[in-house]
Amino acid sequence: MKMFKPLTATLFIIVTLVYAGYSQANISALGDLSKYRGFNYTPAGAVSPHHHIDQWVKYSAAVTNFDLDLAKRLNLNQVRVFVPYEAYLAIKDTLKDRLRHFVQACHIRGIGVMVVVGKGPWVQDTSQRPRAIEWVKFLSAALSSRPGLAMWDIMNEPDYPEKPLERVQRNFENCRFMSRLFREIDPKTPITIGMAFEKNMETLADYVDVLQFHDYSDTREKIDQTILRAKQFAAKAGKPVIDGEIGCIARANPYDVTLEEHMKAHVGWYIWELMIVRKGWGAVHGVFYEDGTVRDPSIAAAILGFFRNRNDILPAIVDREGAITRVIDDGNGWLAQQDADWKKGLDIAETAANLLEAGELAPMHVPPTWEVAQLRRGQPDVHALQNLIKKYLQALAPFKKPAEK
């Protein structure tokens, strides 16, 4: 058996530890990750498919500050933000200051920052790895000493899609390489990998300090099962675990449902995403429009821990005081007039719309009050108003109290 000399043996141990995933990261600085209330962030005005690049190339401190104030109002305390390598290539001279402003703006609001490191040409061509080294050195020099930086996410969803397998294996090898690289260049900042699937989170567990999975399951049972598996593996691995992406109305993963299950399970989470990005994922994701209004108030309520009662409910009786009966009578009377007053018709429509929304008697995909507001803003269109009132009266009719005998 060949014997190692003392120095050779020491170097062998060091190299082995690093390559096996040994970490010196300051995990304790992250605090209790079960209390993480996070969000993925892209400005509402970013444009797909290069929205994560444009976020930095067209960086606006004013927009950032406004959006982060919205997050603070919801008591959110973590953010996950993408920094593509292409942004570095585009604005190498100014990117550092923009990153620092973002992290500082988050820090003063009590929001920790997870930076998702964009992939580069080295993923497919390992001869390009010197560019990855340059990239990681840049990021570390820019942010590692800054208060507010929580962790590096070294690759987003390397396991999605799951086919072809060769692609996934290549991505996993990149994750191992980037993990070793970050641990060499910035050993104190924790590392995570945003895995699309919990099962794959387990595969690269040795290369992270914080386990991370994403979940958009379409039933509570599936959500709970995924969380349970993640927690069980995390306990076995002795590492904290978070869910880095939740919430998508197009995947039957309502924000209020998934948030409630994660809160009950005491697992930290990051919603996708804070802003409604009109030319990105905004049709199926997001809490706030660019002006600070919301599409669905139940999402904001759920983030604050207030959930819909789905057990012992008390259905609303909207016509308890005759409001539905009156607006139906008023509406039919207005419709019967030859020269009906435009403003009176709008008032009838608005009253009907308010009853529909307040009693949750109408779908909110297009809010009835929005339809009325559109008519108020435009030129008088009697035919459109007549059709709207007819639609509202028809929707209200089933909820009219029967006449007393």
Features from the language model and the residues they span:
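Bacterial N-terminal signal peptides
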Residues: A9-V18
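N-terminal carbohydrate-binding accessory modules
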Residues: S23-Q78, T192
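Short, acidic/polar
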Residues: W56-A71, A132-L139, A196-M201, I223-I227, ...
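Aromatic-lined substrate-binding rim segments of carbohydrate-active enzymes
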Residues: V63-P121, N171-D186, P254-H262
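Active-site groove signature of glycoside hydrolases
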Residues: V81-P84, G118-D125, W135-R167
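Extracellular glycoside hydrolase catalytic/binding regions
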Residues: A141-S144, G148, P158-V277, W281-A302
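Amphipathic, heptad-repeat alpha-helical segments
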Residues: D319-E371, L396-K405
